[in-house]
């Protein structure tokens, strides 16, 4: 019997796959538990529609990420932060991704998740720092951050 998996089933198939499984396994286990449904014409067309809408949604996300990359990498987009520092230019604390995300939202009205910023270590020095930002699995931008002394 051909079925369309509605969720991942270990050793059998992944969500959205169409596979041939034994009749008893499909009728007694997969279909009653909602893990699969019979692959008839209506279900096949529904799956194709879902696939098209998912692809369209991914394309929109990619376009939005590319647009945001243009804004973030613009020369005028520099996130300004201040902190207390010693005479040698080293800060008494550090600047985290949360502070950068908050400042970016306040200064440019761009809401960005702090987990998308990839800092190897917190920023502890004054001056300009380039922070890599992963906007999409295909799009990575660089955000300029300027840290000045209070």
Swiss-Prot record:
Task: Enumerate the InterPro entries for this protein.
Answer: Ribosomal_bL9 (IPR000244), Ribosomal_bL9/RNase_H1_N (IPR009027), Ribosomal_bL9_bac/chp (IPR020594), Ribosomal_bL9_C (IPR020069), Ribosomal_bL9_C_sf (IPR036791), Ribosomal_bL9_N (IPR020070), Ribosomal_bL9_N_sf (IPR036935)
Record flagged with keyword Disulfide bond: no
SUPFAM superfamilies, alphabetized: L9 N-domain-like, Ribosomal protein L9 C-domain
Query: Organism's domain of life?
Result: Bacteria
Q: Which GO terms describe its molecular function?
A: rRNA binding; structural constituent of ribosome
Q: Which UniProt keywords apply?
A: Ribonucleoprotein, Ribosomal protein, RNA-binding, rRNA-binding
Sorted alphabetically, the Gene Ontology cellular component annotations on this record are: ribonucleoprotein complex; ribosome
Q: What's a single GO BP term from this record?
A: translation
Gene3D superfamilies, per database record: Ribosomal protein L9, C-terminal domain, Ribosomal protein L9, N-terminal domain
Q: Which PROSITE patterns match?
A: RIBOSOMAL_L9 (PS00651)
Q: Which family does it belong to?
A: Belongs to the bacterial ribosomal protein bL9 family.
Recorded hits in NCBIfam families, A to Z, give: L9
General function of this protein: Binds to the 23S rRNA.
The record's section on HAMAP family has: Ribosomal_bL9
User: PANTHER family recorded for this chain?
Assistant: 50S RIBOSOMAL PROTEIN L9
Q: What is this protein called?
A: Large ribosomal subunit protein bL9
Species assigned in the record = Limosilactobacillus fermentum (strain NBRC 3956 / LMG 18251)
Which gene carries the instructions for this protein? rplI
